[in-house]
Structures are given as C-alpha cells and as structure tokens.
C-alpha cells in the first residue's frame, strides 16, 4: 500500500515560533515513518515558507535521520528552499500544522488548507478563531450561562489614550493580585502577574507587544 504523505508545518510569525520548533521535533520523532512519508515545511519569523529536506548525520553506527534535530535547534533555515504554499497539495495528502499562536491556532492557516482542499489536523476555521480570541470566547461562554472568572478587556487604543482609566477599572472590578495576558496568544507568552498598579501597567504594556488587546 502506498504510504500517505504528511506535511509537517512548523515555525511561523508568532511569538511562539521557538515553541513550535520543539513541538514539531517531538511529532517528527513520534510518527511511524514506516507508515507515512513526511514532507517538512518551515515558516520563518518573517513569514517565508521553506521546504526542508530530510537530513542525515553519520556517526559510528552509520547514517541517522537528524531532521528533527535541525528543526529543534533552528538550523533548518540554512538548508530550506523557497516554497510556494499554493503548491502544497502537489506534495501532501494531509497537513499537520504544528504551530502555536497567531497565524496558526487562530484559523488563518486552517483557511488556507480549506482553500487548497487539503485535509488537516486540528480544529476548523471558526472553532480555531473563536477559541484563540480569549475575549470572544469568554463572551460566548457567558452567553451560554457558563461560569467564568472575572475579566476586563483592554484594547491597545484604550491603553494608549486612557490607560489610567483602564487600570482603575481593573482595580475596581478585579483587584490585586491579577493576571494579564494577550487575548490572542498561547502557552505563557506575554503573561504577567500584577500585585500593584505599577506592575499592572508594565503587564499591560508587555501583553500589548503580542496582541492589539
């Protein structure tokens, strides 16, 4: 039986780029290569798509596939070749995005797969977009009558023009200590604990480096 071709897509433009490399390396090591052919595609921090060839290293026991290693340590960009994402369907039967944060977990790359008519792993476009945006997901949870923690949404525009009012609102409705996080990031990137006003302002500034709200 002909082996299915799995496209492992990693990297990306988000602040979780490095986390994605670790995840992709783990997935590559775990997949049964007797059953599947793997096609590696890395996306740089600048958004450039690169096809990464299978790489072998030699030691006393012979040649070994070290592709997962070069992805994990970041040297894949040196061996990758320019790749047009519109050609993806020519090379893979199934896409497995192993990426985190914006541009992957928020429905955008899922939309690309849908347009290219490529089956893919993970949630669909709508579920990804809603789940990634913590403000939207909390509104939906509330409307469904589910219990959630108290929260306040601060946009970049509000923080820029009326930050003191935003801080006062957090102090009044949540208090200290509180946690501040970007609305559209995963892992623990951009998250801070604030125990006073100065820490809260610094936490808001940090979170807004990763997201507009």
What are the roles of these predicted feature ranges?
Residues 1-121, 125-126, 130-132, 136, ...:
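ATP-binding N-terminal substructure of ATP-dependent carboxylate-amine bond-forming enzymes
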Residues 2, 6-10, 14-15, 22, ...:
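Active-site nucleotide/adenylate-binding loops and adjacent lid/helix of ATP-dependent enzymes
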């Amino acid at each position: 039986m002909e082996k299915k071709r799995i496209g492992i897509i990693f990297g990306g433009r988000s602040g979780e780029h490095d986390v994605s490399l670790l995840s992709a390396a783990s997935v590559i090591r775990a997949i049964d290569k007797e059953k599947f052919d793997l096609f590696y595609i890395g996306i740089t921090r600048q958004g450039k798509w690169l096809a990464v060839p299978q790489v072998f290293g030699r030691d006393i026991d012979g040649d070994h596939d070290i592709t997962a290693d070069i992805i994990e340590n970041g040297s894949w960009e040196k061996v990758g070749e320019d790749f047009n994402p519109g050609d993806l369907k020519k090379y893979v039967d199934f896409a497995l995005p192993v990426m985190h944060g914006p541009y992957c977990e928020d429905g955008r790359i899922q939309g690309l797969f849908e347009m290219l008519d490529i089956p893919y792993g993970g949630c669909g476009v709508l579920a990804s977009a809603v789940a990634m945006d913590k403000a939207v997901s909390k509104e939906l949870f509330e409307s469904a009558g589910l219990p959630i923690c108290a929260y306040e949404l601060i946009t970049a525009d509000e923080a820029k023009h009326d930050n003191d009012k935003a801080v006062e609102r957090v102090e009044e409705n949540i208090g200290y200590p509180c946690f501040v996080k970007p609305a559209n990031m995963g892992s623990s990137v951009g998250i801070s604990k604030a125990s006073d006003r100065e820490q809260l302002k610094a936490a808001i500034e940090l979170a807004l480096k990763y997201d507009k709200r």
